[in-house]
Amino acid sequence: MATKTAARVRKKVKKNVAEGIAHIHASFNNTIVTITDRQGNALSWATAGGAGFKGSRKSTPFAAQVAAENAGKMAQEYGVKNLEVRIKGPGPGRESTVRALNALGFKIVAISDVTPIPHNGCRPSKKRRI
């Protein structure tokens, strides 16, 4: 039997980032919030499903707010103060995520809508039935 050697645990050095970009992907079923640095390297991310909401409760503005708070708290550990917000998708969490990030104390520099719009590409699916 081989003897066990103690594995060295290296503490990861957290980089200090002053400004970041909050990418909000708000679909009809879920909301994904990713906070990156200026180069696009992810610092933190959170989803409505990961915040404990399942099923139809994931697609609520409150679930998106909780996801934004979780991602924002992790990003504050990196020293992020200013955020540029990029929103993608038509979901119900579009506005509440921006409000939650603002309430956490981030200075929101710009808000832009980057929802991809086809130039008459693929045929869309049938109308959503309730």
Swiss-Prot record:
Assigned keywords, A-Z: Ribonucleoprotein, Ribosomal protein, RNA-binding, rRNA-binding
GO cellular component: ribonucleoprotein complex; ribosome
GO-annotated molecular function: rRNA binding; structural constituent of ribosome
GO-annotated biological processes: translation
A Pfam entry, by short name: Ribosomal_S11
Role according to the record: Located on the platform of the 30S subunit, it bridges several disparate RNA helices of the 16S rRNA. Forms part of the Shine-Dalgarno cleft in the 70S ribosome.
Name of protein: Small ribosomal subunit protein uS11
Species assigned in the record: Thiobacillus denitrificans (strain ATCC 25259 / T1)
